[in-house]
Amino acid sequence: KVSDSAYSNSCSNSQSQRSGSSKSRLSGSHSSGSSGYGGKPSTQASSSDMIIKRNKDKSRKKKKNKGAGQGAGQAQTLISASTSLEGRDEEKPRPSGTGCVEQQICRELQDQQHGEDHSEPQAAEQLQQEEDQSGSESEADRVEGVAKSEAVQSFPIPSPLSVTIVPPSMGGCGGVGHAAGLDSGLAKFDKTWEAGPGKLESMTGVGAAAAGTGQRGERVKEDSFCCVISMHDGIVLYTTPSITDVLGYPRDMWLGRSFIDFVHLKDRATFASQITTGIPIAESRGSVPKDAKSTFCVMLRRYRGLKSGGFGVIGRPVSYEPFRLGLTFREAPEEARPDNYMVSNGTNMLLVICATPIKSSYKVPDEILSQKSPKFAIRHTATGIISHVDSAAVSALGYLPQDLIGRSIMDFYHHEDLSVMKETYETVMKKGQTAGASFCSKPYRFLIQNGCYVLLETEWTSFVNPWSRKLEFVVGHHRVFQGPKQCNVFEAAPTCKLKISEEAQSRNTRIKEDIVKRLAETVSRPSDTVKQEVSRRCQALASFMETLMDEVSRADLKEGSGGSGSSGNFTTASNIHMSSVTNTSIAGTGGTGTGTGTGTGTGTGTGTGTGTGTGTGTGTGTGTGTGTGTGNGTNSGTTSSSRGGSAAAPPVTLTESLLNK
């Protein structure tokens, strides 16, 4: 009875075998060639062997063709599904396991055949319904099955075996006609994968989610994505589905490829330096994720698919977008192996990268920003070379930090604002005398990446070496006051340069050189300035005292109304005696007379006239003076002195005596 049912089935479905055995089976056996992995034929030896065996059996007996056709169709379905999930982890072929799977499948098929004898009409009707359902199934439902099968996979590197994926609706048991329908379904599924990168972009994106069973809503696009990289060889092991929304790549396109291939050439050195510095930190801190983080900015390549740019992919230039990468080093979980082989430390380290796109800070041209706009810092040396740039400057200026470091900051100032910057740096040098002093300068224009200028307000601080008194670096905390004319700061700058006359260029060059020379000068100490100020004030005070004493002495001389005579000064040891003779005239005021004399001993001088004055001095020398005063009448006054044999001392002024004391 079993053979009769099989014979009737084979007779009724012989036409479907002839029509679909050549073309549909060929497309089904080479489904991996159209899946995006270079068009290589499938490496599944088991499925191809089963197809060849079925062709041989068909030429011999139709009776055996029934069982062989069922076994081949079901084996191709299940083996391809199993190898798609397990083939990525296999590094060596396992033919014995595949044979066991085939034997088990054949035994299950034979058991099912006994149950189909009593329900052959119902099975045929059910088979027809399944074929109709598979023929009318939408493309999004098949993609949903692909996504479910991929969700089971963990971190393995993809292989060509994993490409031959059978949608869930094409599974199940059936006859030879169902095997032909399965081959045609695989051919349709290959056409789905052959639809190009434009179709692949929508498979893991919003389109696949919205075209599902209707129970799930449209997925919200994410602004960032994450990926896991093996530190052993730099291969990408896992990416989040949001990479399609951010960069346009299909989710699986990064798997098995080096991450640095997607980084811009100018940023690869920065990426490598961050990795080399981050690994020792992770090892020293025990690879704790929260303690081994670092952040930097790079340019990542965007996908050139048919959906984003249409045809002619080769002729279009490669576009890059700025991203802020957060690095976290982790150790991969240990895997149990049958040979009890333990992985050494360091070989199982993983790198988790979270990439966030950086957008421009400006919405409209020439935008006036508020006082609450974020600040960013730029530090440069005394020679004007930029040594540090804050990552917050990327969205405001369009430059990555590595693009500015090592360049002269003078090249970014507007040529009409160089005179303002010269005054600013003069103030920087003056404020450098006091540690921690800061000031705000006038607004000035700064060149950004797209060739436009922004208006900056800056708070300046500086650091002076306390030993050499040389300026080490200048820090500017900038805030954008007015935005550029072009909102997108990441666009390429125009090739044409601003035309400036030769005279203006020479003047600008001279101003830049003057600024650099001024920054190279020695900064005076605050104590030296105080000493100079005190010394200047002391000199002014001494000059004032001398002038005051001169005025006092002149006032004393003008108090008499007649002639006056002054005697010399006599010094004995440390005592100073002054004698003066004043003559008074009745008729008028007399003049003054002076005289000098030398001698030793003691002498007294007396002047006679209308009035008398007496002066007595004792010392080693005697001075003699004669004064004559005239008015309406004539009066004379004389002073006599005695002379001795000793030498007279030089006269001493009042100011000198005060200074001597």
Curated annotation (Swiss-Prot):
Forms a heterodimer with timeless (TIM); the complex then translocates into the nucleus. Disulfide bonds: none annotated. Phosphorylated with a circadian rhythmicity, probably by the double-time protein (dbt). Phosphorylation could be implicated in the stability of per monomer and in the formation of heterodimer per-tim. Residues 108-120 have a biased composition (Basic and acidic residues). The run of Gly-Thr is implicated in the maintenance of circadian period at different temperatures. Deletion of the repeat leads to a shortening of the courtship song cycle period, and thus could be important for determining features of species-specific mating behavior. It comes from Drosophila sechellia. A motif (Nuclear localization signal) lies at residues 53-66. Keywords: Biological rhythms, Cytoplasm, Nucleus, Phosphoprotein, Repeat. Residues 591-638 are annotated as: 24 X 2 AA approximate tandem repeats of G-[TN]. Residues 223-358, 376-482 form the PAS domain. Gene3D superfamilies: PAS domain, Single helix bin. Sequence repeats lie at residues 591-592, 593-594, 595-596, 597-598, 599-600, 601-602, 603-604, 605-606, 607-608, 609-610, 611-612, 613-614, 615-616, 617-618, 619-620, 621-622, 623-624, 625-626, 627-628, 629-630, 631-632, 633-634, 635-636, 637-638. Its main location: nucleus. GO terms for biological process: circadian regulation of gene expression; entrainment of circadian clock by photoperiod; negative regulation of transcription by RNA polymerase II. Residues 1-34, 635-646 have a biased composition (Low complexity). It is found in: Nucleus; Cytoplasm, Perinuclear region. Residues 53-66 have a biased composition (Basic residues). This is Period circadian protein. One of its GO terms (cellular component) is perinuclear region of cytoplasm.
